[in-house]
């Protein structure tokens, strides 16, 4: 137990510095915005949605079905909300548990000695695990590994207890259930069944390739045949159920996720896909350069046979074949009690022996021997060591390295990444075993004590360096800014783009703009980056530039609904209503098939319809507005906040004098968000109109209480007081509103109106003057300023404002009438007029 405890403790200690880390990268979508984690969402939705909260059968789903992992996130959310500390704690504890189980598994293969320690410590400290442990979404890989090892250990028990029917099939059942759980943590967990079959055939029974078929059909090997058959049946059942549950359709990804898959050249696809496992192995061997994302151009495509990286591919597969040949073709030899050797159960005086760990350490004590139990029948004639030979361990290590990695090779279907470090969490078990057994074989082979010491210290140094790299890399996962800055050298386009989002959230606008432009320098057709840059420019009132980048974003991805939405909003605010209307309509017609995030798309489409309804509403087309609002309600996703939409429905019904319907929607708005201020104000107006004055006043006062800094609340309350002939109170509310929102034309203009109606003409003049300065080319503002100046006896200033208003709107009858009256007064007073 010491090796397990020490290895687990190291795995725990190395990741303690992640407990203070924030949510990073994929954590946002899988946790922070995932509706399946919320208490109001039925927990059963977890079993119908993918890892990101999208319906599994939806055409845009990633098909990543990991309900047990999502369930663990939901439990975290129920206990600690969105505090990242508890999420990181669970990840670290899971890694420590997996490390302990892996060390226990290694002990079965390597014995209780230094080499088991080495395997466990190497796994605990390997830097390739940082994404899986420090990144919260990596819990899927760590959880799958936990049940992967439990399944494998149960199967090993099943093999060793053959002949005891109840116990052996109990262990087999446990192995199958754990394999199913591993798959429900992450898809590659199901591959443990294939690894178990490799263990049974090549390690427990020590068969070679040419012996499998002749041996497996022998009557005495019926239990082996039955076990392998059940493994195949259970694996096929799990895969069949998995395919059925996701709608029998493979996932679809954008070309930037996996550029090789999108290449038209068969040669490019072939060379690149053959090279990628080589690159993954290099990350295991030398995890010096790590990145949060390896998509896009992080690994350039191999387009010709002359690409020097093809040499790496050749070397990799040559080495792999040689290792496989060594493990599968070499005779497997065991030492008998009498000192002779046994090859696959037959005596062989010339074979080599399989030494135990104790013998490797030059001890005189031999490993314990057990009576051979093979194929369910005890064999007391020949005995063998408990430890498998080096060849057997090489075969099992290769199976652990290769088989769990196969789903990520694009062999059966294209995947949505080029390289994913967290996918290597399970294969790294095979890698650690392979390195350990190689070091052990070398240690046994050399004779000089100096060389043995050198091997010992070299492996210890490797573990130390791995641990240091892990601790340093964990620092990059502390927050998104550090993470994205660390990835610039590997994937500059993605890293700069994501860094821009972080800098923008920190209000570092110029730095964010620079980051977005850097991202577009490396990859100019990234729709998300074009959109994000457009949004940044829009928020800083650079509308012409924003429209340009929105247009480029739509050109790059015609289904990007959010770009249409913001384009329409800018056009509407610029008075280009027909262009805005067409833009909103086009957005509303975009289907959500094959989209990466259908929930976000539906939210944008709903917002487009909401703004289209507002456009119709402002134009006085209330029936058309209602029709659009109803369509928006039908299309809105469950995470969409509907209070503004419901409130506008009420407004439209009120304008159509359908007061009961209006009241219904105002109440719906307040039900969906009890502190929604616009609904308090509009519902208050309706109550005042229908004679429920005290209820109306309560709503106005509640709105002010909710946000005492919002001038519009005082404005509505002031209008109510004015209608109630409470003129002094109304005037106070008007002044308060104008002071709070002195840059908002509507508030200032309406405040001036109210003060004028309250006969406070001097105060009214002040705010009419401010309104005219806010909109110097708005005829109504100039006309009303002229009128109040007229009343206050400032006749020449009044004339100037009337004339300016008529320049902007020559046919305005009221202004013309007021000007004529003004001239009459001025002539009576002997003042010079522009007419004369």
Swiss-Prot record:
Residues 22-84, 129-132, 242-312, 421-422, 471-836 are extracellular. GO terms for molecular function: dolichyl-phosphate-mannose-protein mannosyltransferase activity; mannosyltransferase activity. It comes from the Eukaryota. Pathway: Protein modification; protein glycosylation. It is a multi-pass membrane protein. SMART domains: TPR. TPR repeats lie at residues 493-526, 527-560, 561-594, 606-639, 643-676, 677-710, 711-744, 745-778, 779-812. The keyword Transferase applies. It holds the Pfam family TMTC_DUF1736. Transfers mannosyl residues to the hydroxyl group of serine or threonine residues. The 4 members of the TMTC family are O-mannosyl-transferases dedicated primarily to the cadherin superfamily, each member seems to have a distinct role in decorating the cadherin domains with O-linked mannose glycans at specific regions. Also acts as O-mannosyl-transferase on other proteins such as PDIA3. This is Protein O-mannosyl-transferase TMTC2. It comes from Homo sapiens (Human). The lineage of its organism: Eukaryota, Metazoa, Chordata, Craniata, Vertebrata.
């Amino acid at each position: 137990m010491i090796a397990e405890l020490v290895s687990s403790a190291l795995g725990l200690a190395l990741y303690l510095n992640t407990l203070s880390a924030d949510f990073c990268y994929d954590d946002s979508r899988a946790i922070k915005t995932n509706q399946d984690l919320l208490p109001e969402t039925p927990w059963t939705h977890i079993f119908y949605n993918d890892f990101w909260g999208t319906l599994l059968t939806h055409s845009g789903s990633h098909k990543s079905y990991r309900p047990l992992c999502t369930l663990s996130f939901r439990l975290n959310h129920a206990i600690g909300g969105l505090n990242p500390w508890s999420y990181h704690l669970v990840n670290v504890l899971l890694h420590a548990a997996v490390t302990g189980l892996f060390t226990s598994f290694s002990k079965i293969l390597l014995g209780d000695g230094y080499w088991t320690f080495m395997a466990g410590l190497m796994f605990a400290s390997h830097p390739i695990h940082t994404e899986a442990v420090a990144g919260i979404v990596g819990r899927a890989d760590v959880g799958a590994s936990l049940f992967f090892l439990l399944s494998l250990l149960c199967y090993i028990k099943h093999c060793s207890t053959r002949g005891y029917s109840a116990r052996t099939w109990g262990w087999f059942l446990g192995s199958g259930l754990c394999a199913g759980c591993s798959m429900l943590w992450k898809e590659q967990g199901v591959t443990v069944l294939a690894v178990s079959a490799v263990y049974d055939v090549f390690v427990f029974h020590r068969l070679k390739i040419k012996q499998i078929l002749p041996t497996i059909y022998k009557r005495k090997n019926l239990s082996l045949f039955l076990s392998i058959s059940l493994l195949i049946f259970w694996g096929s059942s799990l895969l069949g159920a998995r395919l059925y549950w996701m709608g029998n359709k493979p996932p679809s990804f954008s070309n930037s996720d996996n550029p090789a898959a999108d290449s038209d050249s068969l040669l490019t696809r072939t060379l690149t896909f053959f090279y990628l496992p080589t690159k993954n192995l290099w990350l295991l061997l030398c995890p010096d350069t790590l990145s949060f994302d390896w998509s896009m151009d992080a690994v350039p495509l191999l387009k010709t046979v002359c690409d020097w990286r093809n040499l790496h591919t050749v070397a990799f597969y040559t080495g792999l074949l040689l290792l496989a040949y060594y493990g599968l073709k070499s005779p497997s030899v065991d030492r008998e009690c009498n000192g002779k050797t046994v090859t696959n159960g037959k005596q062989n005086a010339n074979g080599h022996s399989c030494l135990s760990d104790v013998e490797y350490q030059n001890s005189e004590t031999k490993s314990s021997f057990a009576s051979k139990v093979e194929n369910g029948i005890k064999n007391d004639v020949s005995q063998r060591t408990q430890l498998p030979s080096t060849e057997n361990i090489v075969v099992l290590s290769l199976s652990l390295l290769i088989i769990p990695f196969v789903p990520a090779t694009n062999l059966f279907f294209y995947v949505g990444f080029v390289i994913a470090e967290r996918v290597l969490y399970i294969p790294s078990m095979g890698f650690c075993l392979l390195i350990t057994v190689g070091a052990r074989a070398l240690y046994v082979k050399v004779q000089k004590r100096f060389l043995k010491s050198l091997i010992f210290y070299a492996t210890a140094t490797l573990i130390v360096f791995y641990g240091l790299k892990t601790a340093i890399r964990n620092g990059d996962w502390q927050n998104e800014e550090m993470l994205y800055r660390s990835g610039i050298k590997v994937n500059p386009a993605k890293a700069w783009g994501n860094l821009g989002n972080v800098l923008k959230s920190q209000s570092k606008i110029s730095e964010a703009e620079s980051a977005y432009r850097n991202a577009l320098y490396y990859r100019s057709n990234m729709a998300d980056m074009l959109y994000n840059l457009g949004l940044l420019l829009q928020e800083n009132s650079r509308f012409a530039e924003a429209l340009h980048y929105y247009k480029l974003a739509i050109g790059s991805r015609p289904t990007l609904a959010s770009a249409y939405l913001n384009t329409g909003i800018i056009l509407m605010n610029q008075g280009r209503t027909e262009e805005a209307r067409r833009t909103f309509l086009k957005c509303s017609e975009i289907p959500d098939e094959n989209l990466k995030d259908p929930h976000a798309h539906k939210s944008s489409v709903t917002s487009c319809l909401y703004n289209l309804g507002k456009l119709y509403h402002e134009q006085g087309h209330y029936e058309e507005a209602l029709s659009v609002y109803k369509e928006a309600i039908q299309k809105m996703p469950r995470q969409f906040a509907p209070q503004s939409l419901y409130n506008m429905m009420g407004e439209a019904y009120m304008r159509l004098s359908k007061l009961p319907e209006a009241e219904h929607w105002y109440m719906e708005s307040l039900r969906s968000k009890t502190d929604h201020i616009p609904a308090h104000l509009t519902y208050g107006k309706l109550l005042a109109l229908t004679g429920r004055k005290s209820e109306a006043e309560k709503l106005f006062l509640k709105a002010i209480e909710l946000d005492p800094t919002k001038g519009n609340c005082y404005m509505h309350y002031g209008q109510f007081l004015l209608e109630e002939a409470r003129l002094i109170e109304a005037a106070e509310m008007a002044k308060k509103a104008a002071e709070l929102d002195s840059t908002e034309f509507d508030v200032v203009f309406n405040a001036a109106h109210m003060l004028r109606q309250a006969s406070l003409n001097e105060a009214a003049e002040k705010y009419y003057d401010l309104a005219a300065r806010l909109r110097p080319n708005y005829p109504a503002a100039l006309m009303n300023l002229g009128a109040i100046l007229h009343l206050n006896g400032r006749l020449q200033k009044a004339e100037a404002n009337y004339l300016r208003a008529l320049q902007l709107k020559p046919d305005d009858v009221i202004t013309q009438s007021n000007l004529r009256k003004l001239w009459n007064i001025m002539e009576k007073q002997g003042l010079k007029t522009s007419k004369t």
